[in-house]
Amino acid sequence: MAPSFVSIDTTPDFDMTPTSSKSADSGKRTLLLAPPSIATQEDKLRTLFTTYDRSTTDLQMLDRVSAGFVSLPANTYDLVLVLTGTDGTRRSEALQLLKREVYAAVVPAMKGGAKLQTEDNFFGEAEDREAVLAGLVKKETGFEKMDVGNGAAVPLRLGRKKKAAPAPAPVVQPPPIISSDDNDLNDDELIDEDTLLSADDLKRPIVPPPECQPKAGKRRRACKDCTCGLAAQIEAEDRERREAADKSLNVMKLESDDLNELDFTVQGKTGSCGNCALGDAFRCDGCPFIGLPAFKPGQEVQILNDVAQL
């Protein structure tokens, strides 16, 4: 079977010579996008080409453009007009076919700054969205393709930053040498602290500040860095109490020899009078054994329930 070839028709669907047309600029071309129903209305077509110059105007059917049967030349048209009828009679049919495939074929065929419009200047929300996604810009009467073809690349000449000169290294100064010979200090310049207070100042009682006063139920304490004299006063009072306690202990303190004199349980030791073990008749008035029976020297004496046990 011989292979089949598919050819794409790039010629306009209609080639009618208008009886009269408006004068148009030969440099500008117009693309008319018509719904399929207009092909059956010959009077509409004749009226259409009396308005637009056929030499600068191309007519294509929306269904053929949407199906990809028509290949449009790139960057050719200054105006793309969708034939919806001036009164909107064919709006529903035309906008129903104005889909993304139509925008994909029409937008590349538009020149920079070309316009996309309808006869009644109406676009639905879906058509607006598809036009913006295709790269067109919303205008008052339709959409416009931005003219970016005349742009030229302009090199940016950025001034190079001048390299800052390195900061000079700081000069390290040797540390100053401190010598005792430089200090010409005399004893005459020193002040004796004791001479700053008079005799009356020394007699005055030390009054601690209110914050140093002890709280109720608590012992008076001085601060660690006390400068009001409270710490010295408390230390002096504690020292006096210790000295008084030591004196009271020294009154009752006995030497080892004194203990041996009174300890009659030690063999060979007797009292100063030597008669403590003989009985009350032979004991002194201050003898600690008064009231006890006679016992042998060295015999152990125990006190049980305030009763001497021999």
From Swiss-Prot:
Residues 273-287 are annotated as: Fe-S binding site B. Residues 167-177 have a biased composition (Pro residues). Belongs to the anamorsin family. The C-terminal domain binds 2 Fe-S clusters but is otherwise mostly in an intrinsically disordered conformation. The N-terminal domain has structural similarity with S-adenosyl-L-methionine-dependent methyltransferases, but does not bind S-adenosyl-L-methionine. It is required for correct assembly of the 2 Fe-S clusters. Component of the cytosolic iron-sulfur (Fe-S) protein assembly (CIA) machinery required for the maturation of extramitochondrial Fe-S proteins. Part of an electron transfer chain functioning in an early step of cytosolic Fe-S biogenesis, facilitating the de novo assembly of a [4Fe-4S] cluster on the scaffold complex cfd1-nbp35. Electrons are transferred to dre2 from NADPH via the FAD- and FMN-containing protein tah18. A motif (Cx2C motif 2) lies at residues 284-287. [4Fe-4S] cluster binds at C273, C276, C284, C287. A motif (Cx2C motif 1) lies at residues 273-276. Residues 1-30, 165-184 are annotated as: Disordered. Keywords: 2Fe-2S, 4Fe-4S, Cytoplasm, Iron, Iron-sulfur, Metal-binding, Mitochondrion. It holds the Pfam family CIAPIN1. It comes from the Eukaryota. [2Fe-2S] cluster binds at C212, C223, C226, C228. PANTHER family: ANAMORSIN. It is found in: Cytoplasm; Mitochondrion intermembrane space. Monomer. Interacts with tah18. Interacts with mia40. GO terms for molecular function: 2 iron, 2 sulfur cluster binding; 4 iron, 4 sulfur cluster binding; electron transfer activity; metal ion binding. Residues 212-228 are annotated as: Fe-S binding site A. Residues 155-202 are annotated as: Linker. This is Fe-S cluster assembly protein dre2. The keyword RNA-binding does not apply. Its cofactor is [2Fe-2S] cluster; [4Fe-4S] cluster.
